[in-house]
């Protein structure tokens, strides 16, 4: 069903480093990521679950699965978007996340909305 244009969701991610919530001396690097999920298909659909693969700079990978996002299972009409912000802690200055959302259209069709890999990185300051 992934190639059917009736069932298409676009995901945009904007990550940022949270210096004020990080303690590098203790190996704690906090990142926030803002997500925009838009129903680009022709059928209303609900986001049911999330699946993340989080990889730190040492190659350690963690799988995170759960219902909905930020306590919600948003229902999106065609063209409608849902925004949320969440966060993650890493033990390294950089890493990446990728994953997908499980979606169910109003007609009962199940499909996934892929989340392309994005980089989490502490910005460098030039002196």
Curated annotation (Swiss-Prot):
SUPFAM superfamilies: ApaG-like. Residues 3-127 form the ApaG domain. GO terms for biological process: error-free translesion synthesis. InterPro entries: ApaG_domain (IPR007474), ApaG_sf (IPR036767), Uncharacterised_ApaG (IPR023065). It comes from the Bacteria. PANTHER family: F-BOX ONLY PROTEIN 3, POLYMERASE DELTA-INTERACTING PROTEIN 2. NCBIfam families: PRK05461.1. This is Protein ApaG. It comes from Xanthomonas euvesicatoria pv. vesicatoria (strain 85-10).
């Amino acid at each position: 069903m992934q190639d059917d244009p009736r069932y298409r969701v676009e995901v945009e991610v904007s990550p940022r480093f949270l210096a004020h919530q990080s303690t590098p001396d203790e190996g704690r690097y906090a990142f926030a990521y803002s997500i925009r999920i838009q129903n680009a298909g022709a059928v209303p659909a609900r986001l049911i679950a999330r699946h993340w693969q989080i990889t730190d700079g040492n190659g350690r990978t963690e799988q995170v699965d759960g219902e909905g996002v930020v306590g919600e299972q948003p229902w999106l009409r065609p063209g409608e978007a849902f925004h949320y912000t969440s966060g993650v802690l890493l033990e390294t200055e950089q890493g990446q996340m990728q994953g997908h959302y499980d979606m169910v259209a109003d007609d009962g069709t199940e499909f996934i909305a892929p989340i392309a890999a994005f980089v989490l990185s502490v910005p460098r300051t030039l002196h």
